[in-house]
Design a protein with these regions (language model features):
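Alpha4 helix (beta4-alpha4-beta5 surface) of REC/receiver domains from two-component response regulators
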Residues: 68, 89-104, 117
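The short loop immediately C-terminal to the conserved phospho-acceptor aspartate in CheY-like receiver
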Residues: 16, 59-60
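Non-catalytic signal-transmission and effector/linker regions of two-component phosphorelay proteins
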Residues: 1-9, 113-132
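The feature encodes the CheY-like receiver
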Residues: 20, 62, 90
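Two-component/phosphorelay signaling modules centered on CheY-like receiver
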Residues: 17-35
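A Lys-centered signature of the CheY-like receiver
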Residues: 108
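Acidic catalytic/metal-coordinating carboxylates
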Residues: 39-42, 65-68
Length: 132
């Protein structure tokens, strides 16, 4: 069985329970350990608790926006790979996310296969950089 994400912990943050569940099932099917959060405040708390390798982050969240969460995540000593997923196609939002250090910016709806491929590729690239 193809388990490209074995050994990795992935935090999935989205306020839509259906999206959250489908992303979590897809990541687990690839061997990842997962944690979930439904709002920005919970996302920061979960990130501190599980120290994820990657975070899949919705931009529009209750309590604390995805941008504020991204800012917190990139301040850590070993920041995770962060993939922001959003239905908002504004170029300013993408530019702002990039200025904060987002690893990838994807528009909803995003296929689970594409999401898994991007997470896997970004984690592999990071692993290769640390071993050089």
């Amino acid at each position: 069985m193809d388990t490209r994400l074995s050994g990795y912990t992935i935090l999935i943050v989205d306020d839509d329970p259906d999206i959250l569940e489908s992303m979590e099932l897809a990541m687990r099917a690839e061997g990842a350990t997962t944690a979930v959060a439904e709002d920005g405040t919970e996302a920061v708390q979960e990130s501190e608790r599980v120290n994820p390798d990657a975070v899949i982050l919705d931009m529009m969240l209750p309590k604390r926006s995805g941008f504020l969460v991204l800012e917190e995540l990139t301040k850590t000593d070993s920041p995770p790979v962060v993939i922001m997923v959003t239905a908002n196609e504004g170029k300013r939002h993408m530019a702002y996310a990039q200025s904060l250090g987002v690893s990838e910016y994807l528009y909803k709806p995003v296929s689970l296969d594409r999401l898994i491929n991007r997470v896997s590729t970004l984690l592999e690239e990071r692993a290769n950089q640390t071993h050089e």
